[in-house]
Amino acid sequence: MFRIILERIEHSLKFSTLQEVDFGVGFKTKITERKFNRNSIGANDILFFQLSERPGQTLFFSSAVFKQSIINELNRLNNYLNRPYSIDNEPFPFSLTF
């Protein structure tokens, strides 16, 4: 399930249709700007994210670390909720909106 969601994120980014990622518990990450030179994401492309729960704070992800950044953030949120999970054997605890 987790891998499928990451693939959906990547697919949406490639076609510039993803507007907001919702991790639940009031945490949403919105893409505020894209800098793409091609139809696909390259290692030098930068994604700009705005945390809706923290006005003025922007996250910068290069596509090279995009997947790991999402995984790290999900782990951080799960630790905050005291709900650690294993990607391979537990259901995905958050939802994404497209």
Curated annotation (Swiss-Prot):
This is Putative uncharacterized protein DDB_G0289765. It comes from Dictyostelium discoideum. It comes from the Eukaryota.
